[in-house]
Curated annotation (Swiss-Prot):
Gene Ontology CC terms, in alphabetical order: ubiquitin ligase complex
Pfam families: Yippee-Mis18
Name this polypeptide is given: Protein yippee
Occurrences of domain Yippee (ranges): 13-110
GO terms of molecular function: metal ion binding
Encoding gene (name): Ype
Keyword Transcription regulation applies: no
Subunit field text: Interacts with hemolin.
Length: 121
């Protein structure tokens, strides 16, 4: 198998895999905290890195029929949530390409300021 390439988005507030602490995303990518997954509270994000994806599945959810992929941590394989590929309801189209991370399966951590933000001119 080769080396696993992992990305890091940086930021002041980070979200990581609860199993292996691999960085997944940051607060600036957060769209909503008003979702529910199999383990309870879940968050919707614009961009999440260091994931692998299952095959597409059709699921009927509270908000309608969706085509989704389960998402797993690229480093340890832990299931973390799902990604919306396609929504049949027009009002749900904003979810397409977005990722749900279940709060019980991730951790929040303090990040660090970017170099550009700390450099004075």
């Amino acid at each position: 198998m080769g080396r696993i390439f992992l990305e890091h988005l940086g930021g002041l507030k980070l979200f990581n895999c609860a199993q292996c602490h691999t960085n997944l995303t940051n607060r600036s990518q957060l769209i909503s905290t008003r979702f529910t997954g199999a383990t309870g509270r879940a968050y919707l994000f614009k961009r999440v890195v260091n994931l692998t994806f299952s095959n597409i599945q059709e699921r009927v959810m509270l908000t309608g029929r969706h085509m989704v992929r389960d998402v797993m941590c690229k480093n340890c394989g832990a299931k973390l949530g799902w990604m919306y590929e396609f929504a049949t309801e027009e009002s749900q189209k904003y979810k397409e390409g977005r990722v749900i991370l279940e709060y019980a399966l991730i951790t929040e951590a303090e990040g660090f300021p970017s170099e550009a933000a700390t450099t004075s001119h």
